[in-house]
Amino acid sequence: MITKKTLLYNFIFGASTDTKIKTYYHLLEPLFHTMSDHNMFLNLGYHDKNESFPDSIVTTQENMVENVTKDFNKLGLWLDVGCGTGAPACHLSKMYDDIEIEGINIVENQIVKARILAEQKELNDKVQFLFGDACNMYSENESYDNIYAIESAFHFENKLNFIKEAHRTLKPDGKLAIADIVYKPELAKITDFYKVAIAKHGLATKEFYSGE
């Protein structure tokens, strides 16, 4: 049995970025489920400041997914890079009749949960979840009509390789959309304070995401 102490050790001293990412999501799984009201979303969500704040955080998460993909042609095969537990892909595939989505992820237990979610929502004919590395995809050239990565790109050890792979696997008129977490220097005093507190509890710091 893997203990929390072992997970924390793997997170802090893990030999690879992949190990740290897997451990990070394993440790914070209960928190993400609480944040998403157990609807399997792992992203932070998107709130338009000109609108009243939604009653449910799930609404903001759905807003994020819809906003990221709003300029896509709503047909063909899409790729969800860093698909989490499958909620974004399932949400989009229910919205649009003429699309299919493949999701890739390096966190095995999330793939299992994504497949369960697809079965529960009766979407097995429209979504597929596979183990896959965003920086070294198995897909053939020009496989996808659109590719999106929602709050996952900051994990990629070599972001240039991801861009190259996205370019290789996109069809000529395909689009790539990325939602990332951006660090603002003017917030340095606040983030430096919280960085110390976060590190004490074994959570990810800015340096972990940026590769510093």
Predicted segments with their positions:
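N-terminal auxiliary segments of SAM/dcSAM-dependent transferases
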Residues: M1-M35
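Conserved alpha-helix/loop element of class I SAM-dependent methyltransferases that forms part
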Residues: D55-L75
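Class I SAM-dependent methyltransferase SAM/SAH-binding core
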Residues: L77-L79, T85-N136
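A short acidic, Gly/Pro-enriched loop at the edge of an enzyme's catalytic core
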Residues: C135-I147
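A short SAM/SAH-binding and catalytic strip from SAM-dependent methyltransferases
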Residues: N146-E157
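A short glycine-rich, Lys/Arg-flanked "PGG" loop and its adjoining helix->strand segment in the class I
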Residues: L160-K175
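Short, glycine-/aromatic-enriched active-site segment of Class I SAM-dependent methyltransferases
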Residues: V182-T205
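Short alpha-helix
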Residues: K206-E212
